[in-house]
C-alpha cells in the first residue's frame, strides 16, 4: 500500500516533490494571496515519510507560516528512492 511504501525504512538519497499553497505578498495591492508552488529536493533520509518531514521542516523556516502543506499520503507529495549514500 502507499502507507507501507511511505514508512518503509530504506536509508539513502531521496528525491521529494511537493505541490503546496504558498502565501505571498502582492506588492501592487499590499495584500496576501495563495500561490501554487512546486518544490523539488534531493535529501538524505531514512524513508519517504522522513523525506517529507525534512522538506516541511525546511520550508516552514523559509515561507510564510500561513502556507498550506499537503498530507504526505495525498497526490501532492511524491518521492522516489535514488540509492544508498556512500
For each of these PLM feature ranges, what is it?
Residues 1-9, 82-86:
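Short intrinsically disordered terminal tails
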Residues 57-86:
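Short, mixed-charge low-complexity intrinsically disordered segments
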Amino acid at each position: 500500500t502507499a502507507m507501507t511504501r511511505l514508512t518503509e525504512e530504506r536509508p539513502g538519497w531521496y528525491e521529494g516533490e511537493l505541490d503546496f499553497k504558498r502565501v505571498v505578498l502582492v506588492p501592487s495591492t499590499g495584500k496576501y494571496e495563495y500561490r501554487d508552488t512546486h518544490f523539488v529536493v534531493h535529501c538524505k533520509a531514512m524513508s519517504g515519510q522522513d523525506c517529507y518531514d525534512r522538506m516541511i521542516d525546511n520550508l516552514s523556516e523559509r515561507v510564510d507560516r500561513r502556507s498550506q502543506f499537503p498530507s504526505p499520503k495525498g497526490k501532492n507529495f511524491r518521492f522516489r528512492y535514488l540509492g544508498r549514500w556512500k
